[in-house]
A protein has these predicted regions:
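A cross-family signal for N-terminal binding/gating loops and helix N-caps
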Residues: 1-207
Length: 207
């Protein structure tokens, strides 16, 4: 699987917890609105722009996507989001109910979809089209695609070493999940490990 570092647009450390939100499709409009209330840096203003409109108003998708873009621009303008100067991999660990999961935040090549990157279920065309329009309006991929692969001892050893460093982010979300992220400043050390992944399966983020 071809996986690459990238110039991330990411939160500054002191705003990471406030910006962090669950995936857009696991909460209702009412739940997202309640969670974002009084939190101007909540990323729900980007991923769930419907909450910016009066309750009961069904704003056209085009207006919602433009509202999302305005919210993203505001977060960048005020300095809550910053761009990495060079391409970087990120090592990401989350701990839920005592069980850790590790992964890499990176970019993969869409040309590998259908061969090296495989889906596990069918998706709805209307949802796919809406997400495409959302990403196009933002000119930014605001939510990750979640890929799974088999455990690898070389990756585990790499993670064990990297996790000795001070993380960029380390916070516990309201749902009790702890999120920790380390930048991998030497991508040439990680790249050979990722190149040996034979295939990956799309677990989420494709709707």
């Amino acid at each position: 699987v071809r996986i690459h570092p990238f110039r991330a647009l990411r939160p500054i450390p002191e705003r990471a917890a406030a910006l962090s939100v669950p995936p857009y499709d696991v909460v209702t409009t009412e739940e997202a609105r309640a969670l974002a209330q009084g939190v101007p840096d909540s990323f729900f203003w980007v991923t769930r722009p419907d909450i910016a409109f009066p309750e009961g108003e069904a704003a056209p998708p085009e207006r919602q996507h433009e509202t999302a873009r305005q919210a993203l621009d505001r977060l960048i303008r005020q300095g809550s989001l910053v761009r990495e100067e060079v391409p970087v991999y990120f090592l990401y660990r989350l701990i839920r109910k005592g069980r850790p999961q590790r992964g890499v935040v990176a970019c993969f090549e869409t040309a590998d979809y259908g061969t090296l990157i495989r889906r596990h279920e069918k998706t709805r065309p209307d949802k796919e089209e809406d997400r495409q329009r959302h990403v196009a309006a933002l000119r930014t991929h605001d939510e990750p695609v979640f890929l799974l692969c088999r455990d690898r001892s070389d990756f585990t050893a790499f993670c064990d070493q990297q996790e000795q460093a001070i993380p960029l982010y380390d916070f516990t979300a309201p749902d009790g999940v702890r999120h920790t992220l380390w930048p991998v400043r030497e991508p040439d050390r990680l790249a050979p490990i990722l190149e040996r992944i034979p295939c990956a399966y799309i677990a989420d983020g494709h709707h």
